[in-house]
Regions:
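Enriched for short, Lys/Arg-rich terminal
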Residues: 1-7, 16, 26, 41, ...
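Hydrophobic/aromatic residues within well-ordered alpha-helical segments
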Residues: 10, 21, 25-28
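A short, surface-exposed loop/turn module that caps and links secondary-structure elements
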Residues: 34-59
């Protein structure tokens, strides 16, 4: 029984944030995305205005980063990436 590959899509906000990173930082983000692809429930589920959104926290060079995403069994949609400062306010947009 072969499993279908998971499709990963990204929002324009995530793409903008990702583009600004250095290569080493991009590797850390790629590792975090692989963790999310393997187990989408690893992130913390949000409530209220952000219901249905999960946030995975990881570190890049001692800086805590947050990656917001939504998922269903076949896809992972990356919404935003950034530090905690104003992260949730920007995610609501």
């Amino acid at each position: 029984m072969a499993t279908q590959p998971v499709q990963v899509t990204q929002s324009s906000a995530f793409a903008r944030s990702y583009k600004k990173l250095h290569n080493r930082q991009k590797q850390d983000v790629n590792s975090a995305v692989q963790v999310i692809v393997a187990d989408p429930l690893v992130g913390e589920g949000k409530r209220g205005d952000l219901a249905g959104v999960y946030v995975y926290k990881f570190k890049i060079q001692a800086q805590l980063m947050l990656l917001a995403y939504e998922f269903d069994p076949a896809t992972r949609h990356l919404l935003s990436l950034g530090t905690h400062e104003n992260f949730y306010r920007e995610s609501k947009r």
